[in-house]
A protein has these predicted regions:
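N-terminal module-boundary/linker segments of secreted carbohydrate-active enzymes
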Residues: 27-98, 360-373
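N-terminal substrate-binding region of glycoside hydrolase catalytic domains
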Residues: 57-159, 303-306, 332
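Substrate-binding cleft of secreted/luminal carbohydrate-active enzymes
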Residues: 63-76, 295-373
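Hydrophobic faces of well-ordered beta-strands that scaffold small-molecule active sites
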Residues: 71-73, 97-101, 127-129, 175-179, ...
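Alpha-helical scaffolding within the catalytic cores
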Residues: 79-88, 109-119, 159-164, 230-248, ...
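Substrate-binding cleft of extracellular glycoside hydrolase catalytic domains
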Residues: 108, 115-222, 226
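Glycoside hydrolase catalytic-domain groove-lining segments
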Residues: 111-132, 251-307
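Aromatic-lined carbohydrate-recognition surfaces of secreted/lumenal glycan-active proteins
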Residues: 214-240, 293-306, 333
Length: 373
C-alpha cells in the first residue's frame, strides 16, 4: 500500500469513529431520544474497506461468524422447581442462560417474589417473565373486568403494578419482562385488540402507562419485550400493518419477540401442516424487522412429534436455520406437554437432538453479552 493510500484509509476510519461516538453522545443528551431502559453500549459499525492487507491470492473470503444466540427453557414448574434443568445441563455440558415462567395478575405467581429472581440469578441464569393481566382461569372467555379500559387504564391496578415496579427496582439485576403478549385478535386474552372492546390505541396507552409506573420507580433493570403473535397464512403486508399499528415505538421497547410453533397437521390455530422453523418465521420476521430496529427474541418455540421428525426439526432449526435470521438473539423452548407434545423429552431422539445442538459454541453465549448487544 503506498503512503497516500494509507493516509486516505486512516482518515476514513477516523471519520467513521467520530460519527459513531458523536451519534452516541447526542443520543445520550437529547431529550427526545431518552427512554426508560438501561444505557446501552455504542456498537462500532463494521467496515468492509480493503486495507490492503489481503494475501497475494486476493481478499480474505472468511465469513463473519453468525450472531450468538442465547438458549432458554420454559417449564410449568418454573421457578419453583428447577431440577429438570440440571439433567439438560449435565447432558449438554452447558448452562441454560434464560429461565422463563408466567405470572398472572390474578392467578399463578401474582405477587412479586424476589426469591424467584434470586434463585435464578444464583445459578447464573437470566429470568424471563411473561406478565399477563388476567386470572388465567377462563381461557377462551372474554373476562370483561380485565379489559384494558376496565382494568389497567382505570387505575384499578396501580398499586399492584407499583408493587412489581418497586420490587424489580430493589432487585436491581436484569430481568426480561414480556408484558401483555400476543395482543392482536387473540381469543384467549382479555387485553387483546378486538376482545372486550379493546382498541389498538387502548393497547398502546396501556403499555406506556405500565412502563411509566416502572419508570417512576427507577426500575431500569427491566428489559421490556413486545411480542405479537404469528398469524397463520398471513401475507407480509398484513403482518407489517398489524404490527405497526400496535408497536409502542423503539423508545418504549427493549426487545421484540415472536413465538414459533410447528403445529403439524393437528391444530387449527397453526398452519395445519408440518413446517420448519424457517417456514414459520420468515414472513413475520421480515415484517417485524421492518417495524422495529430492536433485537428479536423467540420466547416460545416448539414442535410437535406428529407429521414429521421432531428430532430433525430441532437439529435443523438450531444448527442451520437460525443463521438465516441475524436479528434473533434468543430462543426459548416451550417445554410442555400441552396441546401437543412440545416437551423436549417427548422422544429420546428429540431430547438427544436438543442436547447435541445446545452444545454448539454459537448457542452458548453468556447472558452479559446478550444484554449488551
Amino acid at each position: 500500500m503506498d503512503k497516500h493510500r494509507f493516509l486516505v484509509v486512516v482518515l476514513a476510519v477516523l471519520v467513521q469513529l467520530a460519527a459513531v461516538f458523536g451519534a452516541a453522545r447526542a443520543e445520550s443528551t437529547t431529550p427526545e431520544n431518552s427512554d426508560y431502559s438501561q444505557p446501552r453500549l455504542p456498537v462500532l459499525v463494521e467496515t468492509t474497506m480493503d486495507l490492503g492487507l489481503s494475501s497475494a491470492r486476493g481478499r480474505d473470503q472468511r465469513s463473519v461468524p453468525p450472531t450468538p444466540v442465547v438458549l432458554g427453557i420454559y417449564q410449568p414448574s418454573f421457578p419453583n422447581d428447577l431440577s429438570q434443568l440440571s439433567d439438560y445441563e449435565r447432558r449438554s455440558g452447558r448452562k441454560i442462560p434464560i429461565i422463563h415462567w408466567y405470572a398472572q395478575w390474578g392467578g399463578w405467581k401474582s405477587a412479586f417474589d424476589r426469591n424467584d429472581l434470586e434463585a435464578v440469578s444464583a445459578r447464573g441464569s437470566l429470568p424471563m417473565i411473561t406478565w399477563e393481566p388476567w386470572t388465567g382461569s377462563a381461557q377462551g372467555q372474554p373476562e370483561p373486568n380485565w379489559s384494558l379500559r376496565n382494568g389497567i387504564l382505570s387505575g384499578r391496578f396501580d398499586a399492584y403494578i407499583d408493587s412489581w415496579a418497586r420490587g424489580m427496582a430493589a432487585y436491581g439485576k436484569p430481568v426480561l419482562l414480556r408484558f401483555a403478549h400476543e395482543m392482536h385478535d387473540h381469543p384467549f386474552y382479555p387485553w387483546a385488540v378486538g376482545i372486550n372492546g379493546n382498541s389498538a390505541e387502548d393497547y398502546l396507552t396501556a403499555w406506556r402507562y405500565v412502563r411509566g409506573i416502572f419508570a417512576r420507580s427507577n426500575a431500569t433493570n427491566v428489559h421490556w419485550i413486545w411480542n405479537p403473535h404469528v398469524i397463520a397464512g398471513a401475507s407480509e403486508s398484513t403482518y407489517e400493518s398489524t404490527y405497526r399499528a400496535l408497536y409502542p415505538g423503539d423508545s418504549e421497547v427493549d426487545w421484540v419477540g415472536l413465538d414459533v410453533y410447528n403445529t403439524g397437521p393437528d391444530l387449527d390455530w397453526g398452519s395445519a401442516r408440518w413446517q420448519s422453523l424457517a417456514q414459520v418465521l420468515s414472513t413475520p420476521y421480515r415484517a417485524i424487522t421492518a417495524v422495529s430496529s430492536k433485537g428479536l427474541l423467540l420466547p416460545e418455540v416448539g414442535s410437535t412429534e406428529n407429521g414429521g421428525s421432531k428430532s430433525q426439526w430441532i437439529t435443523t432449526a438450531l444448527t442451520t436455520e437460525l443463521a438465516q435470521f441475524p436479528r434473533v438473539r434468543a430462543l426459548v423452548w416451550f417445554d410442555v406437554d400441552k396441546e401437543q407434545q412440545w416437551n423436549l423429552n417427548s422422544s429420546q431422539s428429540a431430547l438427544q437432538s436438543w442436547v447435541a445442538a445446545a452444545a454448539q459454541p454459537r448457542l452458548s453465549a453468556d447472558v452479559s453479552m446478550f444484554l449488551l448487544s
